[in-house]
Regions:
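Active-site rim elements
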Residues: 92, 148-152, 247, 281-284, ...
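Solvent-exposed coil/turn segments that connect beta secondary-structure elements
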Residues: 74, 141, 230, 277, ...
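Alpha-helical transmembrane segments of integral membrane proteins
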Residues: 8, 15-35, 425-899
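Short, low-complexity, Lys/Arg-enriched N-terminal segments of secretory-pathway carbohydrate enzymes
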Residues: 1-9
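Metal-dependent active-site segment of extracytoplasmic phospho-/sulfohydrolases and closely related
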Residues: 68, 75-76, 241, 248-290, ...
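Active-site neighborhoods of enzymes that stabilize oxyanions during catalysis
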Residues: 286-295, 300-304, 313-323, 330, ...
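Phosphate/adenylate-binding glycine loop and adjacent helical scaffold
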Residues: 353-443, 468-474, 532-536
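Active-site-proximal alpha/beta segments of enzymes that process anionic O-linked groups
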Residues: 13-43, 47-54, 58, 62-68, ...
């Protein structure tokens, strides 16, 4: 025990930090498991025996085959036939790249009105590919938290249309996106898949689809072809909607649709649709109208019988231009295809058949709606066994259903039932949420204990107790449904822990408080109360939407407090009598305030923000400014603020040249692709420049890694921890700028020099210094174009260095997290440069206080209309930011253990 105490007293800082990080991690996972619950999956499946039918499975099929052509991110206005509805007119500005680029589909709608239909196809948030595929095959609505499965999707186990197809003795063929195989393995008779994660590659997947689909149509042993093209989506991610590459991909898809309509036979129905839309910058994941709205184009070949058109509606530009019906939900495709091919509707489906596709036979349509309602009521009754609140409303709708005698009433009944099931899917585990909050408060208390007790040895019994408590918390996370005993044991342990910390806080020798000095204590620790107030402002959705403004105001206010303290010291206001230190103080304020103002002008806007305009510039337009800013920032870090080591200077300046070459080649690729060309030499040149650009990016990262080792091998004999960390800060600045991109490079450069400048304030006040660093780190997230929304995730960062088909997904994921939360990395490096070993713990404490506010706000507003749009993303991003900051600090501890 003495040996352990001796070891703990000398080398315990990193161990303490690991214990603290684990405590925060488990607390957040417990709360997330209670708040963002995955939908309960029923293992039941539909079958032909569910319905009594003499010759068929459920109903007589209308078609024998179907083709799904999925054009990823096909927004509705991309396919809308403007020429049909508005005549030939000049498109305004950048609209020429994405409007009116599918004229062949417009011609089919105009010339074959009874055989071609177009609907707005509305998806459910989150608009990520995994969730959309799941909805398209099961007819269900995935939960918000399942957006994380987009990186490592789990297999779909519940009933789906592909399983029904196989059970009926039919088969399916897959072409294109390999995600389908990951989610639905062993479902396809033949598959010709390509990797889907490389957003820099616009053509590989699409070309593979085009090369195989016509040969597949010629075969006679298929019933469903799923062809998933990714070029439009990747063009959006890489270039945005207003680019010649977007026009090229839309025209290519338009031509493919025309060729399919000519190749298919009369027994086949073609569905062309998108899985989601995109924003003007090509992003998706959220629930804005542009992200949710995609298109569904349905087509059958004319059969020569003009009196019996296959569809009961025609495309109409006036009024309800979507064929006389309301917009179609994405889940509606599942029951529609099932009954068209005479397949049992998958058990978890909550979609409604698309009536115009079934023709004009009202009696047959009523029967199809009855089958749709039967399946949905069956699912709702089974689901109600697990969701008691559903039962009363279900009984009311069931009574209305029994008295329904016409298609309109039956349609409304199905719609009401679908809405009821959707609302019941939004559930949470309140007891687990409370344990998660209790755990987070305990982690905060543990954090405070480690700060105020930093100079003393942590008692051995406390390590034993916290280890046991961590095991209890782990049991809650891994249990499918935690039992009452687990909850009681964990809560009791947390209560005992909090009581211990409270007693230590009140009576411990190092942090003893006299109540008569309580007011003085509050003022001396105002930064903690200030951060708590900032955290609790998350109860207001307006604060979340305008959080960047609040952070910027807080930074400026804190610096003004530092100025007031300086003025209190320098009461003599003569400019000639002021100390050099005070003049430098004023100079640093003059640098920081305008920098924050400039960064504010270029922040990205959220959909909910009013009077906000996002300045959209191409990377080519911003390249000169990024080059200039990166040079100034590098010079400032190397030659002015911190005198760089010779070996660091030897590495950084050549690295800056490599960065410029990388940007130049990247810019040339963007420019050349913006000008349509069919010349093979041009395409070869583009490929060469792309390869050179990525090779330079790899070289920059490789040289940075070499520097980490070289500085220890060949560095100064007097190299210490602080100098080494300064060299790391100087060295990683250029890879960070490159990772975030030329478009945001100049903003990243601003942030890089703001931290050393802000270091001048509160040099002898560790608490205020850490609070300022924490606020600045949080603001850098917004300064580089990010928002607390899924569609603002910088996917591009994953592909700057690595190819899209890189085997280990955690590596590109780490690049994305670094690009988003690089401010926390910089703040962590700055904290480890301080003499105070508590600085990293203060940094984590301030960040965790903000997370506490997000946690409480998300629980309180769980039923709020804006929960999934504002409060849930806020909690997720704040939690990930805290865990990422813990990871950054852990890595720094590992790298500095030898000092």
């Amino acid at each position: 025990m003495n040996i352990f105490s001796s070891w703990a007293s000398s080398r315990s800082t990193m161990l303490r930090f690991i214990a603290l990080s684990l405590s925060y991690t488990l607390s957040l996972f417990i709360f997330q498991k209670g708040l963002l619950v995955k939908r309960h999956v029923l293992p039941l499946k539909s079958s032909c025996s569910d319905i009594v039918s003499e010759e068929n499975c459920w109903i007589k099929p209308k078609y024998n085959k179907s083709i799904f052509l999925i054009i990823d991110a096909l927004r509705f206005d991309f396919i809308f036939p403007y020429e049909n509805c508005m005549g030939k007119q000049q498109l305004k500005g950048d609209e020429k790249y994405y409007h009116g680029q599918m004229p062949k589909i417009a011609r089919l709608l105009r010339e074959q009105p009874g055989n071609a239909l177009l609907f707005p196809f509305i998806s459910d948030a989150p608009t990520t590919t995994f969730q959309r595929i799941k909805a398209l095959v099961t007819g269900s609505v995935p939960a918000f938290i399942e957006a994380g499965d987009n990186f490592d999707g789990t297999k779909i186990s519940e009933d789906n249309i592909l399983d029904q197809l196989l059970a009926s003795g039919k088969n399916a063929t897959l072409l294109g996106d390999e995600t389908w195989l990951q989610l639905l393995p062993d479902r396809f008779h033949r598959h010709f898949e390509k990797p889907s994660f490389d957003i820099m590659d616009l053509d590989t997947v699409d070309d593979a689809v085009i090369a195989s689909i016509f040969d597949e149509i010629d075969r006679s042993d298929w019933s469903l072809i799923i062809a998933h093209c990714l070029g439009v989506d990747h063009a959006g991610h890489r270039y945005g909607q207003a680019h010649a590459e977007m026009s090229r991909k839309l025209l290519q898809m338009d031509k493919l649709v025309e060729e399919l309509t000519q190749k298919m036979d009369e027994e086949t129905i073609l569905f062309v649709f998108g899985d989601h839309g995109m924003t003007s910058t090509g992003d998706h994941g959220g629930d804005s109208l542009n992200e949710l709205s995609t298109a569904l184009f349905a087509y059958t070949r004319p059969n020569g019988n003009e009196s019996a058109k296959p569809f009961s509606a025609e495309f109409d530009c006036s009024g309800k231009f979507w064929c006389g019906v309301d917009s179609v939900s994405q889940v509606d495709l599942v029951p529609t295809l099932s009954l068209l091919l005479d397949l049992p509707i998958p058990y978890p489906n909550i979609g409604q058949i698309i009536k115009p596709i079934f023709g004009n036979d009202s009696s047959n349509l009523f029967q199809q709606l009855k089958l749709n309602a039967f399946q949905m009521f069956r699912y709702a009754r089974e689901y109600a066994k697990h969701q008691i609140d559903l039962r009363d409303d279900l009984s009311k709708i069931s009574r209305l259903y029994e008295s329904t005698t016409n298609t309109d009433d039956l349609t409304q009944t199905i719609k009401n039932l679908s809405n009821l099931i959707r609302s019941s899917l939004d559930q949470f585990y309140f007891e687990l949420c409370l344990v998660g909050i209790f755990s987070l408060v305990d982690s905060l208390a543990f954090n405070c204990f480690l700060i105020f007790n930093a100079k003393n040895t942590t008692p051995f019994f406390l390590w034993i107790f916290r280890s046991a408590m961590l095991l209890l918390q782990l049991s809650l996370i891994f249990a499918e449904k935690p039992g009452n005993d687990q909850l009681i044991y964990t809560t009791t342990s947390l209560f005992v822990s909090l009581c211990y910390f409270l007693l230590v806080f009140l009576f411990g020798s190092s942090i003893k408080i006299k109540f008569k000095y309580f007011i003085s204590f509050l003022f001396s620790n105002f930064q903690f109360f200030g951060q708590l107030i900032l955290g609790f402002l998350a109860f207001s959705n307006s604060f979340i939407i305008y959080e960047s403004d609040v952070l910027r105001f807080s930074i400026q206010s804190l610096i003004l407090i530092a100025l007031i303290k300086q003025l209190n010291i320098h009461r003599e206001f003569s400019i000639y009598r002021l100390s050099f230190n005070f003049k430098m103080f004023i100079f640093h304020i003059i640098v920081v305030f305008p920098s924050l103002l400039i960064l504010k002008q270029f922040e990205s806007c959220r959909e909910e923000q009013v009077l906000c305009y996002t300045f959209i510039f191409t990377s080519e337009q911003l390249l000169p400014w990024s080059i200039l800013a990166s040079f100034v920032s590098t010079f400032f870090l190397l030659e002015d603020r911190w005198k760089a080591l010779k070996i660091t200077r030897f590495f950084v300046w050549p690295l800056l040249i490599l960065l410029y070459l990388h940007w130049i080649f990247e810019s040339m690729v963007m420019t050349m692709k913006g000008k349509p060309s069919t010349s093979q030499s041009v395409h070869n040149t583009i490929n060469l420049f792309e390869n050179l650009s990525q090779l330079l990016a790899k070289s920059i990262f490789s040289v940075t890694l070499v520097h980490f080792f070289a500085i220890k091998l060949f560095g100064d004999e007097n190299l210490n921890k602080i100098n080494w960390l300064k060299s790391i800060y100087q060295m990683i600045s250029l890879p960070l700028i490159m990772l975030i991109g030329a478009e945001y490079g100049w903003r990243t450069a601003f942030c890089l020099f703001l931290f050393p400048v802000a270091d001048f304030f509160f040099q002898n006040d560790i608490k205020n210094w850490c609070w300022l660093m924490s606020l600045l780190a949080a603001y850098c997230f917004y300064a580089t174009g990010n928002q607390r929304t899924l569609n603002s995730i910088p996917w591009r960062a994953a592909f700057v260095v690595l190819p899209g088909n890189f085997a280990f997904k955690w590596v590109p994921a780490s690049f994305i997290l670094t690009a988003m939360f690089f401010g926390q990395l910089l703040a962590s490096l700055m904290a480890h440069m301080k003499e105070e070993e508590t600085a990293p713990f203060y940094l984590i404490l301030f960040l965790a206080m903000k997370v506490l506010g997000s946690v409480l706000a998300s629980l309180l507003h769980h039923k709020h209309l804006m929960f999934y749009k504002v409060f849930a993303p806020k909690f997720v991003f704040d939690a990930v930011e805290l865990l990422t900051c813990c990871a950054f600090n852990f890595i720094i501890y590992l790298l500095t253990t030898s000092f």
